[in-house]
């Protein structure tokens, strides 16, 4: 399992320009961070003045990132995420993703989306643009069952799951 300091070191050690292999590693480390559901840990891989658009919400800087993620994971319970590389070039990476979660009434959702990332020279994300759609699902339709935290290496990705 990756400890936060190792993951943070690895995330920032992968610097532009990206190769296919380094972009895949960057995507997996981002997935691992978000699956930790630790807003402070996640915020440290973004620049101090990072700019986000997440759905219709605009977030600026690490402090707002922590507040945003704290609200997000208080609402999106039992959150499990899979990210997959879509495209990359120089200092940019595009991913597609899906995550499953339920609300406090027990209603399950699978959220699908795309993110565009831009990194600084140190490998920290300086811009993040996310478009996300929520699909209500039944508990029987769930596909992400690993224990909370990092997705096991042998768990299928989005393409293998047909998502």
Segments the model singles out, each with a brief description of its role:
Residues 2-18, 67-163:
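A beta-strand edge to alpha-helix "cap/lid" segment located at domain peripheries
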Residues 13-15, 49-60, 72-75:
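A short gly/proline-enriched turn/hairpin at secondary-structure junctions
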Residues 19-36:
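Short, aromatic-enriched amphipathic alpha-helices that serve as compact interaction elements
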Residues 22-25, 60, 64:
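Generic recognition of short, well-ordered alpha-helical interface segments
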Residues 36-49, 53, 117:
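Short, well-ordered alpha-helical segments enriched in acidic and aromatic residues
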């Amino acid at each position: 399992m990756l400890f936060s300091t190792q993951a943070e070191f690895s995330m920032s050690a992968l610097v532009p320009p990206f190769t296919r292999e380094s972009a895949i590693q960057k995507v997996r480390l981002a997935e691992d961070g978000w699956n930790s559901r630790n807003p402070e840990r996640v915020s440290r891989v973004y620049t101090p003045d990072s700019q986000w658009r997440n759905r219709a919400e605009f977030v600026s800087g690490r402090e707002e990132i922590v507040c945003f993620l704290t609200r997000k994971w208080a609402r999106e319970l039992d959150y499990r995420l899979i990210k997959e590389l879509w495209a990359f070039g120089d200092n940019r990476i595009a991913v597609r993703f899906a995550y499953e979660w339920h609300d406090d009434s027990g209603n399950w959702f699978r959220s699908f989306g795309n993110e565009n990332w831009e990194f600084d020279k140190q490998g920290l994300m300086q811009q993040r643009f996310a478009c996300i759609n929520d699909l209500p699902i039944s508990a029987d339709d769930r596909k992400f069952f690993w224990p909370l935290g990092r997705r096991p290496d042998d768990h299928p990705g989005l393409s293998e799951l047909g998502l």
